[in-house]
Amino acid sequence: TRYPARAGNDDLVMMVSEDATREQPFAWTAVVLDGYVWFSLKNPADFPATLFWLSNGGRSAAPWESRHCGRLGIEDVCSHFCDSVDLSRKDLLRNLGVPTTRRFSKDEPVTLRNIQVVAAVPEGFGLVKAIVPSGGNAVMLTDENGLTATAAVDWTAL
């Protein structure tokens, strides 16, 4: 495969998180680069999906104006892909168990938390296969080959 692909187009993949459990109390997304990893931790009840954008000038509306080219993006969401709130309210993914909107009330305060971390990883660290709690102030990342790295983070803040 090659990227960027077709000029004037954007592609988007929506990945749905599994529900939180006692053993896995958060959902995560990770990207590994040479010597470090960026990862995001979230409550999947608040952000049930993650969008992976492959932007190459396909969004003509402001503020992009088809100038957003050769870019990759990751966005935690509660939405119907990148569609409008009106379309998300139709709850078209309900039969798959994926909420696309959330009700808010002026009388009920809501906090939506997302933790983003950059941490060092050992040489040769590959595709992240798991991020799990390691006590209350750290997480352990495991790659596809069984290599591990620990990152200090108060994941309980989620």
Where are these regions (language model features)?
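Short, hydrophobic/aromatic-enriched beta-strand segments in well-ordered soluble domains
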Residues: 107-122
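Generic low-polarity alpha-helical segments
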Residues: 31, 114-116, 139-140
